[in-house]
Design a protein with these regions (language model features):
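Conserved micro-motifs of the catalytic ATP-binding
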Residues: 2-8, 41, 45-51
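Short conserved segments within the C-terminal catalytic ATPase subdomain
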Residues: 29-38, 43
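Short beta-strand/loop element within the Bergerat-fold HATPase_c
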Residues: 71-83
Length: 158
């Protein structure tokens, strides 16, 4: 993201459309590993930069595809939680070890034993996009008691 990103005007963004677009765009890649992606319908909206938010959810979903085993599943969901909107990308892959969770958002950080290609910048970019939108990312356990849920909390669009 360029230094002027934080100054671009925000618009009303449909979370449902965002999740549906990511599902549609990444299904062919997920299909190569027989991974199922589902995007739950949502009529929630937030104010933000649509292209940046799309990049954020795409990056998180792409990471989930990379780390989820053949035949796995990924769920894209959104829900209202008081004055916050939570967007979740959940998978049933191997998960992120507790010891690595605090560091995965550092630029160029790669967990030991990671066999997936990448440069270690993706989650740092995701975190920056969340910050620009006054959001926060939490890493939680994923589906079926394993895997990872990346939960981004945004202020409600009033």
């Amino acid at each position: 993201l360029d230094p002027d990103s934080a100054r671009r005007p925000f618009e009303r963004v449909s979370i449902g459309e965002l999740l549906s677009t990511v599902q549609h765009d990444l299904e062919p890649i997920a299909g190569e590993k027989s991974i199922t992606i589902t995007a739950a319908p949502s009529d929630l909206t937030i104010r933000g930069m649509k292209d940046a938010l799309l990049m954020m959810v795409t990056n998180l979903t792409d990471n989930a595809i990379k780390y989820t085993q053949e035949g796995g599943r990924i769920e894209l969901t959104a829900l209202q939680d008081g004055s916050r909107i939570l967007v979740r990308v959940s998978d049933n892959g191997p998960g992120i070890p507790e010891k690595d969770r605090a560091r995965v958002f550092e630029r160029f950080y790669r967990a030991l034993g990671t066999h997936v290609s990448g440069n270690g910048l993706g989650l740092a970019i995701v975190q920056r996009i969340a910050e620009i939108h006054h959001g926060h990312i939490d890493i939680k356990d994923g589906l079926d008691g394993r895997g990872t849920t990346m939960e981004i909390s945004f202020p409600s669009d009033s």
